[in-house]
Amino acid sequence: MPVSTSLHQDGSQERPVSLTSTTSSSGSSCDSRSAMEEPSSSEAPAKNGAGSLRSRHLPNSNNNSSSWLNVKGPLSPFNSRAAAGPAHHKLSYLGRVVREIVETERMYVQDLRSIVEDYLLKIIDTPGLLKPEQVSALFGNIENIYALNSQLLRDLDSCNSDPVAVASCFVERSQEFDIYTQYCNNYPNSVAALTECMRDKQQAKFFRDRQELLQHSLPLGSYLLKPVQRILKYHLLLQEIAKHFDEEEDGFEVVEDAIDTMTCVAWYINDMKRRHEHAVRLQEIQSLLINWKGPDLTTYGELVLEGTFRVHRVRNERTFFLFDKTLLITKKRGDHFVYKGNIPCSSLMLIESTRDSLCFTVTHYKHSKQQYSIQAKTVEEKRNWTHHIKRLILENHHATIPQKAKEAILEMDSYYPNRYRCSPERLKKAWSSQDEVSTNVRQGRRQSEPTKHLLRQLNEKARAAGMKGKGRRESESSRSSRRPSGRSPTSTEKRMSFESISSLPEVEPDPEAGSEQEVFSAVEGPSAEETPSDTESPEVLETQLDAHQGLLGMDPPGDMVDFVAAESTEDLKALSSEEEEEMGGAAQEPESLLPPSVLDQASVIAERFVSSFSRRSSVAQEDSKSSGFGSPRLVSRSSSVLSLEGSEKGLARHGSATDSLSCQLSPEVDISVGVATEDSPSVNGMEPPSPGCPVEPDRSSCKKKESALSTRDRLLLDKIKSYYENAEHHDAGFSVRRRESLSYIPKGLVRNSISRFNSLPRPDPEPVPPVGSKRQVGSRPTSWALFELPGPSQAVKGDPPPISDAEFRPSSEIVKIWEGMESSGGSPGKGPGQGQANGFDLHEPLFILEEHELGAITEESATASPESSSPTEGRSPAHLARELKELVKELSSSTQGELVAPLHPRIVQLSHVMDSHVSERVKNKVYQLARQYSLRIKSNKPVMARPPLQWEKVAPERDGKSPTVPCLQEEAGEPLGGKGKRKPVLSLFDYEQLMAQEHSPPKPSSAGEMSPQRFFFNPSAVSQRTTSPGGRPSARSPLSPTETFSWPDVRELCSKYASRDEARRAGGGRPRGPPVNRSHSVPENMVEPPLSGRVGRCRSLSTKRGRGGGEAAQSPGPLPQSKPDGGETLYVTADLTLEDNRRVIVMEKGPLPSPTAGLEESSGQGPSSPVALLGQVQDFQQSAECQPKEEGSRDPADPSQQGRVRNLREKFQALNSVG
């Protein structure tokens, strides 16, 4: 395809590289359908003049202005402006660039109209030709793109060639470019659908006839590619404006912001496309993998690299797949991969060889035999692999490594390209393991490099302002000079500025660069021209892209007839360029959809946005998102979960930007927007738009969109919309399939990456300005929000909900709320159902902000710290906690988007007084909680039985509260005394000692004590965490099952048998002993025995044997009684070992036996026999059935006790029969 005609130059002014003929407009250039007639008469002298020519010598030469005059007449309401305006030679350089932007946009809109009117509507009007699903897959949401760009063209036409107004048009509509993401996601489906159509004779004939009738030299596939190419070029077009715009003039910041915005859009689309390719490749690897016994590969995160290497001492080559969480080693066998091993990145160790520059070794640091000495093909390939392996080792390390330390380690690596140094990819990767680490410890330190980078940029601007004579070239060179010396020279060459390239003399084209490679390969060209060789360097491609193609790519020769096969194969090659290079063992970094320089610029922009985007802005955006505004009316009917939501792109920069929001803004948001726009001449550091761009703050987005489209366009869009709605009416699943075709990217990797984007820490919050004050300069919510991807809660059902505004609180508030929760948790009478004290659900993730750093420690139930529940704690923190709880409730109940009033002076004073005392203890508490939770997850060791003489009383009484889970096991993961010893279980001798200490006067029972207590029998192999004396609620390990066995309530049985003994003694005249009391001095609140009288007790000690066996428990036999006056003692009536090695011991109090009887009991022939046991249990049951309920405050479900006793008897019968 030829480039546009070359124009002469005016004096010393240099003619820019022509932007008229572009990839996006080449179709219309060849199709005789443009509404604009180029002033060719003024160009004729230039072709024969002596000026510097920029014409391109390419095979296709039919793309001059004389061959594409209007044939069908005007097709757009905007074509009346086509020939308007002065000739090119009368315009300044900047004016010509602006004109080029407007005219290329006009031709692009004509191409879109051709797709919608000449293809899509004709298919709709031809019933039976294609099914609605095929139509949706083929065209995607092209009608929405046509509507958006028609409005954008209308805005550009009204700018009167004002560059600031042109730039502001892109800023205002940046929220609506998310529909391009949907289109790009659907583009592979479009290629597949068109290929399938061309296999059908009737459908292929229809498309050929339409092409011939419309006199299009290019097929439909070329037109469907144009939106993908166009959206990736806007930022390059705007860069031409910035290069020739005076930095000191008003509106330069608007131009810069437009560049940033459209670069972010391009980067976002490129990143989503790359993820889609990797996800498809990941599924392909999964299907080709043999002998893999592990989980689905999507659980290991994103596919980072793949390659085939020679391995030392291995005959055949090995293919390595590097994922975010593991390194997979396979052997290629035909088209399949045979699994040979894998090393988790958390256990991966890298050894770089100093002798051989191509070799490096990866090994499992715990298993040295699992070692692979890899030989790369090139030094660049080795550096690429070792760099990413180092990064993943740091990110997956069990310890929390500060972000600055990670960056310092990676910067020491010789391979640390600028693309990764300041790119959004690094921001995402920096927290790739936050989902795992956040449950153990707080998040890493806030990254501060973006701020330094922004300061460097400001200093650079100051230097450029002081040296105006040297122009932009010096600024570009100074920017390049900031690159580290250790980086490869190719990365520096990638940053070659456009101006330095465009100032070169006429450059002969490279025959292999006939089409643009790094954006999307054109679908018709031969593969030799479409795919560059592996040895071709990126800077050569970029030079060709800038110097030869004039910022925009070009189509291949138009005489290619056989386009179907090329489209189905070459496009897919273009979509998987990274995989092709990696499989081929390419030395360079995998290609992307954008040139390296574009990604470098996008990375710089990302860093600037992170430093300037405040936490307050992010909260306001979340509020606005929850209020539901920001979705354009003409966006696709099935909005993409991966699209750039308008509400996430921040507030508008000036008054006209509120047009797209005012339809659905809530009153509160309207107030906040008014404060930001009405009282300040510039918002976020931006100057107001030039008068050349009309500002209409009173018109809603709906009215504006309706007026921007002509009646004919509205009829077209309504017809297409009704077609899809009718299809949805006949097929309920059509809407779901259409939405998936527009927005679906396989889960696995993209889901993890999106959650990482959402877990990015917010920068330091700015002070809340009072009403009427100016907004802080430097905040750029509109453009930064392009990086905020939708959360996993939107993409996948069942994921945790997004972080709400109420959780963004300073650390002091969270600390005091914790103290209030702990104090209320330790108070008597608190039932187990009060899990949502202070408005916090204890089973929801707990978000902790440490010095404005968002960290999350998630447990299955909140675990309080022992320090906070100690009885020596003063009243002041609790009082402050109550005050701050009220404050938090007040803040959380405030309306969205409303500015919060200043805090009460007393609260502020208390906060300052207590913050210094609490901060250190809070940090220790956080670390302790993290360690405990980590130990609980990692520890699978059983509880060791304690020797009889080692029992210690470890805690005082618990405010009279009876235990909720009186199981005699402590958690296996809790160390004793800080030395790693396990807390042992209670032995029989200990039980005797504890009961000997029980003698206290009667004490009225509280409501909590009157309620029956349940014994939980946990049959799992993992120990159950019990309630500690400090008042910590029980939290089972995530590994333990939840099924339990409810034992009878001992207190119920005690009271019933005590009443029976009382009646018996009343009949026999025996004196009564003191009443039964509850112990408050032992850890597990064991019951005390009476001094006299017969009180039957039945308690089970469910013990888990340690690794050395559970032989520490004593053998069955009578226990010596500490109070022999009553003539009674305790007997072990049953001692059974269950199938899961748990030991059940049943003890009963009885009369003191004779020595002979004692010998019989010790040998197992006395009352401990099964017959005696059954008789005693039956006696218990009969007595329980005869006794009525004692107190109404107790659990009314007394009949259930009978069933429990009966079940207990049947269980013992079954166990004895088995034994």
Curated annotation (Swiss-Prot):
Biased composition (Polar residues): 1-10, 431-442, 1020-1029
Alphabetical list of SUPFAM superfamilies matching this protein: DBL homology domain (DH-domain) (SSF48065), PH domain-like (SSF50729)
PROSITE patterns per record: DH_2, PH_DOMAIN
GO cellular component, one term: cytoskeleton
Modified residues (Omega-N-methylarginine): R1107
Record field: compositional bias (Low complexity): 18-46, 630-645, 859-873
GO BP terms in the entry: regulation of cell migration; regulation of establishment of cell polarity; regulation of small GTPase mediated signal transduction
Phosphoserine PTM positions: 76, 433, 576-577, 618, 631, 640, 643, 647, 741, 779, 827, 962, 1011, 1023, 1037, 1040, 1081
Every PH domain range: 296-394
Residue ranges with Basic and acidic residues bias: 446-463, 696-708, 1049-1065, 1187-1197
Functional note: Plays a role in controlling cell polarity and cell motility by selectively binding newly polymerized actin and activating RAC1 and CDC42 to enhance local actin polymerization.
Protein name, UniProt field: Pleckstrin homology domain-containing family G member 3
Organism in which the protein naturally occurs: Homo sapiens (Human)
Gene assigned in the entry: PLEKHG3
